[in-house]
């Protein structure tokens, strides 16, 4: 049975995620006029594009909302963001730049917390401003039903009656003015912006064209580092982690992470850190383009991964990147609270994040230009003396040990050479690769395993092998 209503449920309470913008303001007024009972819910997620968030519910009341509530979701969003940081749940990367999934994070928290607030008011029909072509319509659908299985969905922008009457911004503004509603004639930008405490997304309109660059965007979380007329002074910054969580910036400890994140944003924002231009695959597999800001997350991410590489072994780091990317895509699809995500989250937090304790000192310059000055911690696996090119006492291993290790490699090198000979014989290897490797005569790989030894040494080796095999057989360890 479909949970989506195609027409306005007259006489019933309809909750709407209210931003205070033109579209949702008009939706509230239109639903009231047509006989529904609109109830407005606004999430305080620390959005940088709405500094007066506490005033937004009052606007909803002016447009006819019976209930208008502000739901403080900052703490929940910060906590989910720290989990994403620990897990490396970021799958969109290109050209050395990362999108930190700040909008999908916000949707997970907003979707669940607003629907829970609605349920407290016996509101079980929910609408929001997402369009049918985007990701948010599915994200909110999933999170809404997870929070309230009885939920039904009504979106004015999927209602033919609403769209035919109020199909564009001109029609909406005229409709509001004709009925005497307050109308904030916001300056029309060349793109749309959505933000929360972790980051900002700029997309649509002019940014849909790939000949429009990052430089048409006016950042809201920091400086436009790409502008030559803006001075950016170098700055030395330290970031401290305990058990995978950031706890201090520049030596100042933060007991409350909700206070730490804005400070990280301010530091990174002074340099334009963490801005990226990405082409991505939406949930429906259509390509879209976005310009993203996340100065604080970028700063924390740099320090976190520096410690990660200094602490964990190669396979653990590889699992972090592989599973983190999988988790990032699941979050992007609105599956952050699904079992497969919880499984990955728990594993990465427990076995990767819990070991990340230490401090990283950086020199920030302009944009993503930075230098790591120092890395310290109580449990680093990095020890210079292990691989020092200088003479050291009590070395972990010596030349003879390495000769033995290299000799053991002969087994798999011979196998690899045999495969190359096989491929060459069937014509699979040609062109530049064949020119690089040279002649691949079949059977020559055996020479890798053959040793040039005297008959006496060969006889001794055979005696040792025979004795070893006999001892192993007698001990039951063969």
From Swiss-Prot:
Recorded metabolic or biological pathway in which this protein acts: Amino-acid biosynthesis; L-arginine biosynthesis; L-arginine from L-ornithine and carbamoyl phosphate: step 2/3
Nuclease is among the record's keywords: no
EC number: 6.3.4.5
Binding-site residues, L-citrulline: 99, 135, 139, 192, 201, 203, 280
Subcellular location: Cytoplasm
Similarity field: Belongs to the argininosuccinate synthase family. Type 2 subfamily.
Upper taxonomic lineage: Bacteria, Bacillati, Actinomycetota, Actinomycetes, Micrococcales
Entry-linked Pfam families: Arginosuc_syn_C, Arginosuc_synth
GO CC list: cytoplasm
Keyword set includes Electron transport: no
Keyword annotations of the record: Amino-acid biosynthesis, Arginine biosynthesis, ATP-binding, Cytoplasm, Ligase, Nucleotide-binding
Organism: Leifsonia xyli subsp. xyli (strain CTCB07)
An annotated GO BP: L-arginine biosynthetic process
Protein's recorded name: Argininosuccinate synthase
Binding site for ATP: 17-25, 43, 129, 131, 136, 194
Catalysed reaction, written as an equation: L-citrulline + L-aspartate + ATP = 2-(N(omega)-L-arginino)succinate + AMP + diphosphate + H(+)
Record InterPro entries: Arg_succ_synth_type2_subfam, Arginosuc_syn_C, Arginosuc_syn_N, Arginosuc_synth, Arginosuc_synth_CS, Arginosuc_synth_type_1_subfam, AS_cat/multimer_dom_body, AS_multimer_C_tail
